[in-house]
Structure formats: structure tokens, C-alpha cells
Regions:
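Solvent-exposed alpha-helices and their adjacent loops that cap or buttress functional pockets
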Residues: 7-11, 35-39, 59, 70
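Glycine-anchored helix-breaking recognition loops at helix->coil/strand junctions
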Residues: 31-35, 58, 99-104
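Alpha-helical interface subdomain recognition
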Residues: 44-46, 63, 69-217
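Long, acidic (Asp/Glu-rich), low-complexity accessory segments flanking structured domains
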Residues: 48-66
Length: 217
């Protein structure tokens, strides 16, 4: 948990703590009903006069904001990888269908040039997202500055996931729209990529500020 011990210091007063679920005053209430990632529970935590002992302080006092940003920067690589995997799953599911099952006018729809162009474009974008993820992860592991690369990977991989999962439903037609298969689930799960670990607009802001810093003389 993060709490501000000295609001007069703004973000410099934020401190991290460990709070045990058995701590008096802490309760878990409403479980949210979500569009996607339903296997991961999102619940409301209530803190009613909760007292936290000093030994539960995590790290140094006043360093909570720094820790949180560090977690977010690293987490963005993971979210980018998650969204890339989602794109691959949505693509594979739809590609198998259009090249093996679905026919129109006597031929598989995957054989039509227009469909092949869409599939080729989607695959190119998925591969580009994957390389952005690999590059950000490589820099992180090497101890290099990776913040901009992580933001770019998350931004682009999230965009690709939403785009490809949506197209995949269209490629599959009615079979993509019903819940008998995973196509609609890929689409529902893709939206969170543009939200958690920093929204897409936050990624753009981060990238823009770092670019300005690089090019300002």
C-alpha cells in the first residue's frame, strides 16, 4: 500500500507499506464485474482506522513514488508482452479458420487477395510489436535506460492487440461474434492494455518528454 505521510511534501511524502490481509480495519468488499481479464479479480479494499506498525514500512520513508514509478516502468514491458501474446492468439485462431474452414463463393476466404492483405498487415504489426518488446527487455536486462522503450512497446503492442483482435472477429464473421470460440474474449481482454500500467496517453506523454530531452540543446 502507498500512503502519503506528509501531504505538504506532495509526492515526496508518499511511502510504501506492507499491509497483511488480517490487519484490523482492512476488508475486501465488492468484486468488480469487468469487460475483460475476468480471471484476475479486481476488488475494492476498505481501510477503516487501519494502523500499520513501523516494521511494515517497505523501503525508505518518502520513497514510495520512486518505487511505484519503477514498478510501472518495468511492468510496461510485461504488459506489452501480454498484449503481443494476445495478438498472436487472436491471429492464429482467425487465420486457422479463414484458411481451413470458412468459404465464400466456392473458395476459402483466406485465398482472397483483400483478406490476405489484411492478414499480412496484421502479422507485420504483431512482429513489430514483438521486436519492440524484445528491445525494451534487452535494455532492462543490460541495465540500460529503458523507460522510453518500455513506453513505446506498451503503447504499440496495446494498439496492435485491439486492432488485430477486432479484425479477427470480422474475418471469422458470425463465428467470431459468438461466445462458442475465443475470438470475442481476445477482443474484450485487449482493451485493458490501453489502461493499466499507465494509459496510452501517458505513454505518449512519457515518450514525448524523453524525446524533447534528447533533442533539446
Amino acid at each position: 500500500m502507498f500512503a502519503n505521510l506528509d501531504p505538504s511534501k506532495s509526492y515526496k511524502g508518499i511511502t510504501a507499506f506492507i499491509v497483511d490481509k488480517s490487519n484490523p480495519g482492512l476488508s475486501i468488499s465488492k468484486k468488480e464485474k469487468k469487460l475483460g481479464i475476468r480471471a484476475s479479480s479486481t476488488c475494492v479494499l476498505n481501510f477503516d482506522d487501519v494502523e500499520i506498525p513501523h516494521e511494515n514500512l517497505l523501503g525508505e520513508e518518502g520513497q514510495g513514488y520512486k518505487y511505484a514509478i519503477g514498478i510501472l516502468n518495468e511492468g510496461r514491458i510485461g504488459i506489452a508482452a501480454q498484449m503481443t501474446g494476445l495478438s498472436l492468439g487472436a491471429f492464429a485462431n482467425a487465420a486457422n479458420y479463414v484458411w481451413n474452414d470458412r468459404k465464400q463463393f466456392g473458395q476459402l476466404i483466406g485465398e482472397f487477395q483483400g483478406m490476405q492483405h489484411q492478414l499480412a498487415q496484421a502479422w507485420t504489426e504483431i512482429c513489430a510489436a514483438r521486436y519492440l518488446v524484445f528491445n525494451a527487455a534487452r535494455k532492462k536486462e543490460a541495465g540500460e535506460d529503458f523507460v522510453k522503450d518500455a513506453a513505446m512497446a506498451k503503447l504499440y503492442a496495446s494498439q496492435v492487440a485491439q486492432r488485430v483482435s477486432g479484425q479477427a472477429i470480422e474475418w471469422m464473421g458470425g463465428m467470431g461474434f459468438v461466445r462458442d470460440g475465443p475470438a470475442e474474449k481476445y477482443w474484450r481482454d485487449s482493451k485493458i492494455g490501453a489502461i493499466y500500467e499507465g494509459t496510452s496517453n501517458i505513454q505518449l506523454t512519457t515518450i514525448g518528454k524523453l524525446l524533447q530531452k534528447e533533442y533539446t540543446k
